[in-house]
Each structure stands twice: as structure tokens, then as C-alpha cells.
Amino acid sequence: MKSTAAAPLFQPCSSARAAIQRLCDHLNEAFESTAPAGDSPLRSSDAAFAQRVRSALAEAIADPGLLDESACKGDAHGYRRHLLAADAHGRYAIAALVWMPGQASPVHAHHTWCGYAVVEGKLTESLYRWDEAGACATACRTQPRAAGAVSVTRAGHAAIHRLANESGRRAVSLHVYGVAGAQIATHVNDLVRVAESGVESSIGAISSGLNRDGQTVAPDVVAQTPVREAALT
Ligand SMILES: [Fe+2]
């Protein structure tokens, strides 16, 4: 498939625009230089492709001009997503997520491959194991993700996580999802039931504020929960 420049979805400054375009170029190369896995287009088990995406994210966040202030604005009601670019062929979408202190995602698996890198501040990633018999997720471990951390995740219940900003200052992360730009809020997250009663009750408390992919539909409801989980990662 011939490379096509992804259309910018907002108006970044020139240095940010150039950095985002370089990231798009690298992602295009990743698609065109690696053979699809058997489950294409999910590419859940395509190690060469995942390594290409990981390298593209690492190089992108090393550029101090990647995100201008317009892409780093937060929201007091829940973490905010800024859609930066979308592939003209619908193969991927790129977003910056801004996490104010105390904000977190729901516990979720993914309908597609995705990757993220921490650009600013520090996130905490909680990892979960899927219990097929119980149809629920159990917490395994928690890992700090400081600026510079890069992760690429496969689709499916083999990779379930939750991201949170447990620090006292803003955090910003860069995400790429294997969906078209128009699907970023509806076809990425796969919300799962959590086994632990405490966490499960927290998820349940916000369920009325989220659609099936964790997209916020009633921010004021989400804001009332003890842990402000919203949107998607
Ligand atoms: Fe995620």
C-alpha cells in the first residue's frame, strides 16, 4: 500500500506538525515493511511490527517540539484526549492524553493493538490477569511509568491494564491505536469486570458515565467518583 500523509486533525505549531508527520511516516513504514500476522489487521502477535511501533514512539517523544501547549491542555473532569492525526487508510490514529493529578482510565483490554509513551510527568500502570472461568480480571502488579517509558500492547484479554496519574502534577502521554480516527472513542477499549470488590465497585460507580469503550458520556457523573476514571487509553 502506498504511503499517504495522515491529515492533521488540529492546528499544531510548525515544529509539532513536522514531528507528528515524522511519526506518521515511521508508522507507515512499519505497516509497509512488516508482513501482517495471521490476525491482521489486529497485528496482535506481530513482533516485528510491535518493535517498529515502539521505535517510532520512542523517537517521537525524544523530540521536544512534538506537542505544543494546545495538545497539553487538561480537563478537571477527567483525562483529556487530543486527536493529533489519523491515517488516510484508517490503519491508525494518534492522540495525546493529558492526565491531571488523580485521573485514571478504567480497567480495560483492547479491541486492537495500541502503543503509548509517556511524554511528561509520571503515570502508574496496573496490570491484570484475565480469569476465563470467572470472566473477570485480577490485579497482578503495578508499575511506575516515568517520562520516556514506551509500551506496545496487543489486542485481547492477554493484556489488560489501567493507567493513572497518582502524582501531584500533570502527566502527558502519546498514544497510537490501530483504528481509524473516527473510531478512536468507540473501537479501542474493551472494558472488563474486575474481581477485587474494591476496584469492582469503583468501576461500577462510573459505568453509567461510560459507553462500552470507556468513552465519557456524562462527565459530571464521572467527576463524582472517588477515582476519576474516564475516556480511553
Ligand atoms: Fe489501554
Per-region residue spans from a language model:
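N-terminal leader/capping segments at the start of a protein or of a new domain
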Residues: M1-P64
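A short glycine-rich, His/Asp/Glu-containing loop-to-beta-strand
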Residues: C72-P101
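Conserved short histidine dyad/triad with adjacent acidic residue
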Residues: A95-A109, G156-A158
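Glycine- and acidic-residue-biased ligand/ion/polar-headgroup-sensing regions
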Residues: H110-Y128
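Short acidic-glycine-tyrosine-enriched beta hairpin
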Residues: G115, W130-I160
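A short hydrophobic beta-strand segment most commonly corresponding to one strand
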Residues: G115-A117, G168-Q183
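Ligand-binding loop in jelly-roll beta-barrel domains
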Residues: A149, A155-V176
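Long hydrophobic alpha-helical segments typical of transmembrane helices together
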Residues: L191-T233
